[in-house]
């Protein structure tokens, strides 16, 4: 009798455990709750930043709004830094991450990625007087970037040991460090550099070299396969329907280029 009860308790425990760890934030849960929580950049124009009226605006914000509209649920925007994106998803603080996130094998160990929804490349940007043609020319220079970002991962691999890499907590601080000449080189996304140039036409900034082509993907927690499938259908539908192209034209000033599907 004792053995039977023991088995019953163990079986019950694992059943509850499995339900509690796999059902959280999947498609059916989002629909039943009537709300989707989506992480967006807290300060990374033009993808996500505080607008003139105090609300969050940007490419990723518009995509998040479109996701909620097509799900037919309320949207809760959760502004995050680069370092917060994956932890917030893993701990169920958000259901999706739409925050200029590139996909790589290391990140794919922790979360799932959708097909790409936005164009992006990472590069090194600096004043015209600096002769920089590749990573080796960064030797002895101060390079500013956002800690935990894709640029951080990539430049750390290829920069000479004498490069002084200065990591900042968010993109706003990184960009400010470059414009105030705290660093010699800005390592960031092309859109961030373009935004700086647009804000100040007199700013001396050039693309020195491309570090990596890195389109943006939507992050989905592992185990939420129905939600991932829905997101991929959503992206395909909005590519074909022109909605993503309209968002690209609005925020990046360019047509949506061909993007990889996963």
What name fits each language-model region?
Residues 25-100:
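Extracytoplasmic small-molecule ligand-binding "clamshell" domains
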Residues 36-37, 72-74, 91-99, 141-142, ...:
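Alpha-to-beta junction loops
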Residues 42, 118-126, 194-236, 254-262:
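Periplasmic-binding protein-like
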Residues 61, 76-87, 166-180, 212-214:
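Short helix-initiation/N-cap motifs at beta->coil->alpha
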Residues 61-70, 136, 141-142, 149-150, ...:
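Extended ligand-binding regions for polar small-molecule ligands
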Residues 73-76, 83, 101-105, 115-162:
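A conserved helix-loop-strand patch within extracytoplasmic ligand-binding domains
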Residues 84-87, 101-109, 154-157, 179, ...:
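A ligand-binding cleft/hinge motif common to bilobed small-molecule-binding domains
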Residues 150-167, 204-207, 236-262:
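Ligand-binding clefts/hinges and TM-proximal coupling segments of bilobed small-molecule sensing domains
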């Amino acid at each position: 009798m004792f053995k039977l009860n023991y088995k019953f308790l163990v079986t019950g425990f694992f059943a509850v455990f499995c339900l509690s760890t796999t059902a959280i934030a999947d498609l059916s849960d989002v629909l039943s709750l009537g709300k989707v929580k989506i992480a967006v950049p807290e300060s990374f124009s033009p993808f996500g930043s505080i607008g003139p009226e105090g609300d969050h605006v940007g490419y990723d914000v518009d995509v998040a709004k479109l996701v909620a509209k097509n799900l037919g649920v309320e949207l809760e925007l959760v502004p995050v830094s680069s370092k917060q994106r994956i932890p917030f998803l893993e701990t169920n603080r958000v259901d999706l991450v739409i925050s200029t996130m590139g996909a790589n094998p290391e990140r794919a160990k922790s979360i799932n990625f959708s097909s790409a929804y936005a164009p992006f490349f990472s590069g090194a940007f600096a004043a015209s007087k600096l002769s920089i043609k590749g990573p080796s020319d960064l030797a002895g220079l101060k390079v500013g970037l956002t800690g935990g970002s894709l640029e951080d991962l990539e430049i750390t691999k290829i920069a000479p040991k004498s490069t002084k890499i200065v990591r900042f907590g968010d993109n706003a601080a990184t960009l400010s460090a470059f414009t105030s000449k705290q660093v010699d080189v800005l390592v960031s996304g092309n859109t961030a550099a373009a935004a700086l140039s647009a804000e100040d036409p007199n700013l001396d900034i050039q693309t020195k070299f491309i570090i990596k082509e890195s389109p943006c993907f939507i992050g989905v927690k592992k185990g939420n396969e129905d939600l991932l499938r829905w997101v991929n259908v959503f992206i395909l539908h909005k590519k074909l329907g022109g909605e993503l192209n309209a968002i690209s034209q609005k925020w990046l000033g360019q047509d949506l280029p061909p993007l990889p599907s996963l």
